[in-house]
Amino acid sequence: TDVTKGFTEQFGKQAEHTFFAPGRINLIGEHTDYNGGHVFPCAISLGTYAAVGTNEDNAFRLYSANFPKVGIIDIPFSDLFQDKRSLWTDYFQGMARVMKTAGANFTHGLNVYINGNLPDGAGLSSSASLEMLVGTILNSLFDGGFEPLELVQFGVKVENDYIGVNSGVMDQFAIEMGRANQATLLDTNTMKYEYLPVEMGDNVIVI
């Protein structure tokens, strides 16, 4: 996914940074995370990509190749706490406002080009992937200092309080904390977890 080329086409300049957040599958424990149960998810190679550059507009200027008809959406910093727009940008705005409330200091604007290869509605957590991507972008470029588990909780808060989805912690956790070739046994009640190898060899999992 060449997001740098797409960034240049949309914003007329070169991207300064690239980011990626995976999707996830869950091997055991469907619909148990929001009840405090155990889950066994792992991150996958498909996910959401971003190319990012700075602007001087004190705004987030956002474009998604997955929603080209929407075009570029501007979210001025002064509008972060306005109502959601029922667009994909609500996930970006939600993460930005939660992080701002937690102490993040956005010192300059960003142009952001996003392209994901996770099918919408396929159970691979495209929305959580976008949330963790945004959290990583803002945490990295504005020296937020937030720990990975804090970003996980920010994503859950966005889903529950801003988007309005009654979801648990598994999706964001699996994406933010995932490791290559390992699944994570997570107790969503205590948040204790351990990594276990997933060595498939010549075997495959059909979902």
Give the ranges of each region predicted by the language model.
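ATP-binding N-lobe of GHMP and related small-molecule kinases
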Residues: 1-124, 128, 132-148, 153-163, ...
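Mobile "lid/hinge" segments at catalytic clefts and subdomain interfaces of large enzymes
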Residues: 167-170, 174, 178-207
